[in-house]
Amino acid sequence: MISRRVFLKTAGAVLVGSRASLRGGAAVNAVRYVDVAGSAGISFQHDNAASPEKYLIETMGSGCGWIDYDQNGLLDLYLVNGASRRPNTSKHALRSALYRNNGDGTFTDVTIKAGVEAEGLVGMGAAVGDYDNDGFPDLFVLGYGRCILFHNNGNGTFTDVTDRAGVGNIRKWGSSAAWFDYDNDGLLDLVIANYVDWSPEENFWCGDKGPGLRSYCHPDVYRGQPPTLYHNNGDGTFSDVSKRSGVGIRPGNGLGVVTFDYDNDGWQDIFITNDQMPNFLFHNNRDGTFREIGYSAGVAVGIDGQFEAGMGTDAADTTGSGRSDLIVTHLDQQLARLYQNVGEGYFEDATFRSKISYATFHLSGFGTRFMDYDNDGARDLFMANGHVLDNIQRYHAETTYAEPKLMFRNVGHGIFENVSDQLGPDFLLPRVSRGAAIGDFDNDGDLDIIISNNGQAPQLLRNDGGNANHWFQLLLIGTRSNRDAVGARVKVTAGDLVLYDEKKGGMSYQSAQDPRLHFGLGQHTTVEEVEIKWPSGELTKLTNIKSDQILAIEEGKGLVDRPFPRVPLRSA
């Protein structure tokens, strides 16, 4: 995991056709991100159980997630914890934490009352989805050796149904997961990116024995684990279809996952990032099986053909083509890769042309999202960074353990500009970041960020100023389709601005995202048309919608009344 790669400034970086700028807002917005975690009452501290033995599980987690568990229109927060001692002991067991959004800028720890401690789990990630279509989101917590499924009882409490449901992922190292409906039967299935076959008994000595510098072992030291795919049987149980579906045939060093329809055929595909081996892109064959096509699609490796430390990922349309592009974050001395979807089932490595290469070369990226942070109508790119070695400066004096975050502003024509130093001191504060989830926790129309930090307190970065431009958010509610509407495609037209999005599963690194779709509108105050194609094939069209509001749309019915209370601004 600490191996270096030669920086290849490839002269043949792939170029793509220029497009008109997507931006519909002011050229620059005075957006600042302010860390309000402390003033909001979030006292959580991640424990990584750091030890001289350098157990690999110490450095890989953990994640976080937004979940409106009580369905009051306010995003609540789940933070995954690690382990406090050796992974094979139960002493001093830690717990993860659920914080309820009070609607006044503060949160209350309701973990014990809700019953979602996940105590004793060496926690990694979280995934949120309503697997039984009862209207209340359920919580899946990933970990080393096992995972936990908490069923939402609808009364503020959860029940551990892992054994009954059959989704324990036993003896595997689950990193990230995605709820999605791969067979379009109206029920959410579950795919898990599993990491490596590591154990405390095989925690080999890696590093430089001369000066006694120990490091975490490279993933190549261990055998990779294949992904897991669980099919939802519709009766509260799941069947492991990993092998017969084709998803679990090949081992991988899986860390991140996103499900999206890369070829716009109406069926969700699976992309999994792998650490120091080719990434997986599983094409949905529409018959319950998948075919791995990473190399032929152009996303297995970057343009230089080297294996890289694939960690976080996301998919979104960044050019207005109506096709979803991909981002993959990597270790420092590598590059975060931006793969542009050029159609016909193929992606091109646009990392150099997009101008994200230089800034990402020096940092280790984990959580990442495409997001319109300034609401100008173009999706920008966020990355949470942090090295994997706490003693990295003893190897490389110029590299630090804690690292700053990155924000790249989409300036159109497939080009991004690094604006990280314009977003305030809290945004630049170095941390050992892992998971990241984007969500509008105060319902003011601009996107906030929760970041989980390894061995540190989380950061809740409130977006101040992003709503100077106009915006529009949608909560999609499936009826014939799965209730979360994962797989739905949306087209929004506001004047000359045409935006595309789809309801995806997974994203980022070990983290669960805001379930609502967010659209920045720039200076447009009216959305002329919203077109939704549901996974069932049904079409919904709405016209002449005012901007600056959150709407709930139910399949087959249209607009439905749901509360989305605005949270008053509170000083940090």
Predicted regions and their residues:
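N-terminal secretory signal peptides and thylakoid transit peptides that target proteins
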Residues: 1-15
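Structural signal for beta-propeller blades
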Residues: 96, 147-149, 227, 278-281, ...
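Beta-propeller blade termini
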Residues: 61-71, 123-133, 151, 175-184, ...
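Gly/Ser/Thr/Pro-enriched helix-cap/hinge segments flanking short amphipathic alpha-helices
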Residues: 50, 356-358, 390, 398-572
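Short, solvent-exposed loop/turn segments at conserved positions within beta-propeller repeat blades
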Residues: 89-94, 145, 220-225, 276-277, ...
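Hydrophobic beta-strand segments that make up the repeating blades of beta-propeller
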Residues: 77-81, 138-143, 190-194, 270-273, ...
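Short glycine/acidic-enriched loop and turn motifs that connect beta-strands
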Residues: 83-86, 197-199, 277, 333, ...
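Blade-edge motifs of beta-propeller repeat domains
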Residues: 2, 25-58, 99-121, 151-172, ...
